[in-house]
Amino acid sequence: MAGHDSGSAKRGRSPSFGVFVRKPVERAPTKGAGDGAADSEAIRIDAAQPWPDDAVEVGAVVDAYGLKGWVKLVAHAGAGRGGDALLKARDWWLQKGGERKFARVTQAKLHSDAVVAHPAGSVDRDTALALRGFRVFVRRGDFPALAADEFYWVDLIGLDVVNEAGVALGKVADMIDNGVHSIMRVEYPATGKDGRPTTGERLIPFVGVYVKAVEQAAGRIVVDWEADY
């Protein structure tokens, strides 16, 4: 959201598509007045391609690639993981500040630790350079399908967390990858030492020992975890 997005509760594997974490995007060099707009005019949002309700930010354009209009992107979740959505989706929505564009991608592939792609209408290096700094969004519906015991983090964030006794533990506010397995960061209403309302936090490993069920339709995750842990 990151923002990579998936993990396995049963096997405790590292996520194959984790939370989206925005990475710094190098600012494009300033060009002459009107040059950038002219170069990228062929790639734009129009009434036929409205911004989708399920748009998820998955990466950003960082440079041109070659001379034929290809762009180089960094996937917020890491190439090969966040890259999965960038590679599969053929419709991209681009945003930089208040400017939005639509791009139909004709080809996309992994290149070293990045993703390179050719948007239709990007005909040369100058056109590609004009897209530097644009954040890339794809529809959640265009994400690759996962196995039954895998989940995209973007689908877990916001779910209620309850234990097996039905005690509410809070909501998933974030997902963390510690290199071994995923961890849910759960927030809940609490009271501070001064008696004022505050937000408490629980860190629950997203592994089968603790996660007993992910009930997306019901909007909750059932865990073997006590409120006083």
From Swiss-Prot:
It holds the Pfam family PRC_RimM. GO terms for molecular function: ribosome binding. GO terms for biological process: ribosomal small subunit biogenesis; rRNA processing. Residues 1-39 are annotated as: Disordered. The keyword ATP-binding does not apply. GO terms for cellular component: cytoplasm; ribosome. The keyword Protein biosynthesis does not apply. It comes from the Bacteria. Residues 148-229 form the PRC barrel domain. It is found in: Cytoplasm. Keywords: Chaperone, Cytoplasm, Ribosome biogenesis, rRNA processing. An accessory protein needed during the final step in the assembly of 30S ribosomal subunit, possibly for assembly of the head region. Essential for efficient processing of 16S rRNA. May be needed both before and after RbfA during the maturation of 16S rRNA. It has affinity for free ribosomal 30S subunits but not for 70S ribosomes. The PRC barrel domain binds ribosomal protein uS19. NCBIfam families: 16S_RimM. PANTHER family: RIBOSOME MATURATION FACTOR RIMM. Binds ribosomal protein uS19. Belongs to the RimM family. This is Ribosome maturation factor RimM. It comes from Burkholderia thailandensis (strain ATCC 700388 / DSM 13276 / CCUG 48851 / CIP 106301 / E264). The gene is rimM.
